Amino acid sequence: MPLPYRSLTSLVVRYNGHEMMIDCGEGTQTSIRQQGMIGFKQIDVICFTHFHADHISGLPGLLLTIGNAERTEPLLMVGPKRLEKVVDSLRVIAPELPFDIEFKELSETEESFEWQDLRVDAFRVNHNVTCYGYSLTLPRTGKFSVDRARENEIPMKYWNGLQKGNTFEKNGHVYTPDMVLGPDRKGLKLTYCTDTRPTPLIEKYAAGSDLFICEGMYGEKEKAVKAVEHKHMMMQEAAAIAAQADVGEMWLTHYSPSMTKPAVFMDEVRSIFPRAIAAKDRMTTTLKFNDEE
């Protein structure tokens, strides 16, 4: 449940002027307005991990606000089976919108789709209802070689297009990206999961993530039995996954309402994975390519 200083679950990813939201708990709109950097009209995709109220109850009001922001482009929603039925039931108070809603219902253990230049992988986790985690990957091509472009006598007007992966043909000559680009470099990766016990798929998709956002429902060791019973994750378990997956940084989130001071447990958590942070509402970061690569 929400607390006066802690709203319910939602994450917004911004890329190239477009936004994807994952989950939309009660109070999401308020947090967005307080944060001040996110535009409602720019939300193109809303993904849901599962259909418990703390992850979806903020949707009706958000849809009305997106409509009031004069969005007319279709909005994509992604989530487990029955997504369209669940959303339709919530739209009783938001029946008329100036944009269409498209649905992608997940049914497989692992599925993927494209958004902008990113690949989005959805993977099933282990909760007491069907629940998915999401991993977003932005690939990065190899370095452009001016010397190779000149050796292959490629007209300069094609250089920019080749860097973007395009192929060109002129006077019987075909120019392809591999003629001027080195090996692919490490891209950017963000992985998000919540409401789950530890599973091999979480480690698989978190592997190499620049940022791993993971549930840390409980920190007290005496709550471990409760975590297993209700299929949630201990902070220490999340840290172990982060260490095994060799992530750049981990943000813990989705705390139990009984946990008023998550920071109390961070010394123990960091003894397992040093680059762990107890996340707070409206935290932001910018993921950047490593220019040395």
What residues fall within each predicted segment?
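Conserved beta-strand hairpin/beta-sheet module of binuclear metal-dependent hydrolase folds
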Residues: 1-38, 74, 134-136, 182-193, ...
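A gly/proline- and charged-residue-enriched helix-loop-helix capping module
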Residues: 85-94, 103-108
